[in-house]
Amino acid sequence: PAGIGWARTPKLFMKPGEQKNFCIVDAAMNDLPRPAMYQAYHAIVPLEAAGAQQEPQVYDVVGPICESGDWLGRERSLAVAAGDLLAVLSTGAYCSSMGSTYNTRPRPAELLVDGAAAHLIRARESVSDIYRSERLVPTKA
């Protein structure tokens, strides 16, 4: 079910602005397209306490793809610091089935957590994996 999964993403950097602040993370619209496609809401929370020392600020949480639709959450109040990990919640049925390799971004690994044990159930793709089945058309002499 969707409610039991979550996506972990490192925060790449912050981009303060006059009208908006952006929290740029490694996850992108190719990993979780629901927010970009139909403004689906996914809670986003810090996984580490480093940012807890900071006052919460309002951010748009966006990915690194240069697309206007590459966002995971808008106007989120977060206390985050450089290097924090964030969790995008309720993604269980969505990341795996809806994710893509858009912009040659490999799909992330998937883990199954069973109590204190975590099991790798799908390895992270590489760029080589993406291109493996493609074939070039021979050029004419």
Place the predicted regions along the sequence by residue.
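Charged (often Lys/Glu-rich) extended helix/loop segments that serve as interaction or gating elements
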Residues: 1-141
